UniProtKB/Swiss-Prot annotation:
CDD domains per the UniProt record, alphabetical: ATP-synt_Fo_b
Gene name, Swiss-Prot/TrEMBL: atpF2
Keywords: ATP synthesis, Cell inner membrane, Cell membrane, CF(0), Hydrogen ion transport, Ion transport, Membrane, Transmembrane, Transmembrane helix, Transport
HAMAP family associated with the record: ATP_synth_b_bprime
Gene Ontology molecular function terms on file: proton-transporting ATP synthase activity, rotational mechanism; proton-transporting ATPase activity, rotational mechanism
Subunit field text: F-type ATPases have 2 components, F(1) - the catalytic core - and F(0) - the membrane proton channel. F(1) has five subunits: alpha(3), beta(3), gamma(1), delta(1), epsilon(1). F(0) has three main subunits: a(1), b(2) and c(10-14). The alpha and beta chains form an alternating ring which encloses part of the gamma chain. F(1) is attached to F(0) by a central stalk formed by the gamma and epsilon chains, while a peripheral stalk is formed by the delta and b chains.
Role of this protein: F(1)F(0) ATP synthase produces ATP from ADP in the presence of a proton or sodium gradient. F-type ATPases consist of two structural domains, F(1) containing the extramembraneous catalytic core and F(0) containing the membrane proton channel, linked together by a central stalk and a peripheral stalk. During catalysis, ATP synthesis in the catalytic domain of F(1) is coupled via a rotary mechanism of the central stalk subunits to proton translocation.
Membrane spanning stretches: 11-31
Membrane topology: Single-pass membrane protein
Family: Belongs to the ATPase B chain family.
Protein name, as recorded: ATP synthase subunit b 2
Pfam family, one: ATP-synt_B
Length: 156
């Protein structure tokens, strides 16, 4: 291998080419690569943040759903209790009304019975006086008849 001027010329041209590439070509390429690396890293970080936010949102939604179910169950339980209370109150009121109607009916029956007894006493007294008149074959004066009727009514 001969070292001649061509080899030195090629060596100088290569060194100039390497210097030119290092000075003018390499920095924009490295800047583009670094920028691309940064965009990829930012995208991955955003993706991880998004996944964490999604997990937090899902956990929050699950918790809110549980709370809503608990509240709904509480409202349903309160509604059932209130419904039972209303039914009990109405049942009690109906029983009380029934008792009042029955008591009123008994009072009316008792009053009617007393009126009927009084009418029967008067009729019995009148029949007794009529029978006594026939037996005695004479007319009793009004005062004596009234006395007899009152005594009979009192005895009955």
């Amino acid at each position: 291998m001969n070292i001649n001027a061509t080899l030195f010329g090629e060596l100088l041209a290569f060194i100039f080419f390497v210097w030119f590439c290092m000075k003018f070509v390499w920095p924009p390429i490295m800047g583009a690569i670094e920028e691309r690396q940064k965009k990829i890293a930012d995208g991955l970080a955003a993706s991880e943040r998004g996944e964490k936010d999604l997990e937090l949102a899902q956990a929050k939604a699950t918790e809110q759903l549980k709370e809503a179910k608990t509240q709904a169950a509480g409202i349903i339980e309160q509604a059932k209790k209130r419904g039972s209370q209303i039914v009990d109150e109405e049942t009690q009121r109906a029983h009380q009304e029934r008792e009042n109607i029955i008591a009123q009916g008994h009072a009316e029956i008792e009053a009617e019975r007393n009126r009927a007894k009084e009418d029967l006493r008067k009729q019995v007294a009148a029949l007794a006086v009529a029978g006594a008149e026939r037996i005695l074959e004479r007319q009793i004066d009004a005062a004596a008849q009234s006395d007899i009727v009152e005594k009979l009514v009192a005895e009955l």
